Regions:
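A short, flexible N-terminal coil/short beta segment enriched in small residues
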Residues: 1-20
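Glycine-rich beta-alpha loop elements in corrinoid/cobalamin-binding modules
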Residues: 2, 18, 25, 29-152
């Protein structure tokens, strides 16, 4: 199982600390976690190709005001080329009204709300170990078919 933590930064010199923090908190799953940082100035095709080539089963995006439009645009194409991949988001641009975000973004599997470390670790248990269910993970809003469930 491969889990990709993806960040789309405003500039090349910027770094997204959130994805590094999530990876460090879930260090027991280090061999399953991939990390990629991109910029919103890279071509969409370049990023799509790189994400595709990771072979990730789950892709988690860190979403902020400067990248949310870019992430949504990427997601539309990613879902077409990786229809079996699960897509998750976290960050201030998606967590304040996660249900509305999921209704507007049908390609997204779920949103991690609030502080993401414990939630991400629980998602790792779920996806990598096959333990529990999404209904048991606090701090997520997720899609189950046409229904949206809020465990926030």
């Amino acid at each position: 199982m491969k889990i990709l933590l993806a960040a789309c930064n405003a500039k090349y010199i910027h770094s997204n600390l959130a994805v590094y923090d999530l990876r460090a908190y879930a260090s027991a799953y280090q061999e399953h976690i991939l990390l990629r940082e991109y910029t919103i100035n890279q071509t969409k095709d370049e990023i799509l190709k790189d994400i595709y080539l990771t072979g990730a089963d789950v892709v988690c995006f860190s979403c902020y005001i400067w990248n949310i439009s870019f992430v949504k645009d990427l997601l539309c194409d990613l879902h077409k080329i990786l229809p079996e991949t699960k897509f998750w988001a976290g960050g201030p641009e998606v967590s304040f009204d996660a249900e509305a975000f999921l209704r507007k973004t049908p390609q997204m599997t779920g949103v991690m709300t609030g502080e993401g470390e414990k939630t991400f670790l629980e998602l790792m248990h779920y996806y990598v170990d096959g333990e529990g269910s999404l209904a048991e993970i606090p701090g997520i809003v997720y899609r189950d078919g046409e229904e949206i469930h809020n465990n926030g």
